[in-house]
Amino acid sequence: MTTTLWPQVLKQLEAVLNDQQFLTWIRPLEAVEEDNTLRLIAPSGFILDWVNKKLLSQIKQAVYLVAPVNTPEVTLEVGEYAIESFNEPENTSVPQPLRETKAEREAAEKAASSTSKKKSDSPPKKTIKHNLNTNFTFDTFVEGKANQLAAAAARQVADNPGGSYNPFFIYGGVGLGKTHLMHAIGNELMRRDPNARVVYLHSERFVADMVNALRHNKIDEFKRFYRSLDALLIDDIQFFAKKEQSQEEFFHTFNTLLEGNKQVILTSDRFPKEVDGLEDRLKSRFGWGLTIAVEPPEFEMRVAILMKKAAEFGFLLPDEVAFFIAKRLRGNVRDLEGALKRVGAFAQFTQQLVTVDLAKDALKDLLALQQKMVTLENIQKTVADYYKIRVADLLSKRRTRNIARPRQMSMAISKELTSHSLPEIGDAFGGRDHTTVLHAVRKINELKETDHRIEEDFNSLIRIITN
């Protein structure tokens, strides 16, 4: 068995798992290859249990794909307790040179003694696991109207860490680029200073680290490590909800880092004040810096994403195929990437050129499901639930603001997500004229430019309906 097995397995797993799963549960594993066995060593029992229950079958499948002949057995075990990153070395003295004069030796001993005395006050820097995905950079990030403000702010944070945009909080739905931007900042910080103490982790990993530190009486090391970072990047902060002890520890870590002008970057699937189960004092502090949203990609951005990803995957994507996919799939970047991979694989397996007809064949079940989900009736029900009114109100003749605006929103979304004509949409909304639908579409488009709340409602509803 070669020593290249585990890196190849990692590539297989990175392709099939989402970023959160891969970075939180797979990256921390260490691999030892011996006697036709792949020993995977987890840094904690918590991670071992999760991998064993949730991901072991996928790991074994990836191992088989890499080594179908003499496939090694996969075993899991917990390593000696220590999250490598926050263990201090037992001996930090500088190794002595092979040849030295008496004067040089005395000087070295004096320096070592001085270093030893200062150890408790200023622990030495050491290499730590940053957990960054080096593929997620600003260069590989596709910008559009939906994320250009977030991208510009992220670059500012990378240029001036610990500055006015601290903390930097990015929120939005799944697969819209929050994690990519977070890693891009981290990678840029590491590029500029390879010795920077930058760490990315999922909020669940922070909780797991703290639990293990408490269990093994290592809480002081845990605190010292996280509070000594130059930049702390925590994904999906909403998972801190209702975990009081974790919130307490993070609160103090957060304060220490900000007081030291160290950068904190956070993400969530919603606006921080809307995260239920999160302490008010944390929500308040998250607002000290810059909070910014990423929205679902607009049509032009979806096309750009498809073109760029196709180039990365190594196949030519004709414009008309990119337009076809972008028009019919309005979800997140991950959905687009998945659809593109399917089209590319279908073309390779059938040895055909990538055309619109081929894309229709490759995506027919996905498109059928999307069409089944996105109906006028479904749009009406979703909008009514969102605004806490009845579908009957949308179809009625009532013209009060609390009914008229959701009705206009429903019509605009119907025009955006379905192929129904204006008269058909009007007929579905209580027999209204097509000019009423046209007015509603124009009104919502105008309001999206001037009213942030309307724009947020529109994007949230699109996300709910298409996902």
Curated annotation (Swiss-Prot):
Q: Where in the cell is it found?
A: Cytoplasm
Alphabetically sorted, this entry's keywords are:
ATP-binding, Cytoplasm, DNA replication, DNA-binding, Lipid-binding, Nucleotide-binding
Region ranges (Domain I, interacts with DnaA modulators): 1-85
Q: Where is this region: Domain III, AAA+ region?
A: 131-347
Alphabetically, the GO molecular function entries are: ATP binding; ATP hydrolysis activity; DNA replication origin binding; lipid binding
UniProt GO cellular component terms: cytoplasm; plasma membrane
Instruction: Give GO BP annotations, semicolon-separated.
Output: DNA replication initiation; regulation of DNA replication
Q: Where is the composition biased (Basic and acidic residues)?
A: 99-109
Free-text note regarding domains: Domain I is involved in oligomerization and binding regulators, domain II is flexibile and of varying length in different bacteria, domain III forms the AAA+ region, while domain IV binds dsDNA.
- Protein name as annotated: Chromosomal replication initiator protein DnaA
Taxonomic source organism: Hydrogenovibrio crunogenus (strain DSM 25203 / XCL-2) (Thiomicrospira crunogena)
